[in-house]
Amino acid sequence: MSLIMSTISNFFKMIMDSGPTKDDSEDVTMITSDEANELLTLHNKTRNVYNLPPMVLDEDCSLVARSHAIWMSNSQNISHMGFSFFGPVQRMAIVGKEPENIGECISYSIGPEVKDLMRAWFTSESHRSIILGKYDRFGVGRVLGPHDNNYYWCAIYSTAKGAHNVPNVKMSESIVDF
């Protein structure tokens, strides 16, 4: 691994290690595996309505999504370009992945509920196009910001190189209700 990639990888680890953690209160700052699976289920039910194949929860996508949610929370910066101005492609490369396709949805202050997030994303044309995009893998991160008590969300969507060809969907009115 080159010195640059090693330095970036160490920085990536530092961001993950510096993120908020669950404390003794009732507030859950990080998304739980049950919530991640619930969001995946909502995505796949939606994709099924449009005759798209389901996605699977992917550990690498989840790691990249969590780290970006932590970065947005710590920096209070809502952006697809994260630390060192890295986008989702560069963040996936840090974990050793070079997906065929990649997409990212981010959000701020929607709240902790998965259904509220899905409703907000699906009513946005740009987010909906990602949810219904050519992806077969999915990962999500949610962090309660320690500075502002708002929720920072990030979802990473990808298709592995050489994976099956996922069809495009023609966008129209939303036919899904959450």
Language-model features: where?
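Surface-exposed patches in mature extracellular/periplasmic domains of secreted proteins
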Residues: 27-28, 49-63, 76-86, 128-143
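Short hydrophobic helices that act as membrane-entry/anchoring signals
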Residues: 2-17
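A short alpha-helix/helix-coil micro-patch that ends at or immediately precedes a cysteine
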Residues: 15-75
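Short, surface-exposed glycine/acidic/tryptophan-bearing loops
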Residues: 62-111
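Extracytoplasmic
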Residues: 34, 52, 101, 133-137, ...
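Solvent-exposed, polar/charged alpha-helical surfaces in well-ordered, non-transmembrane soluble domains
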Residues: 37-45, 62-70, 90, 104, ...
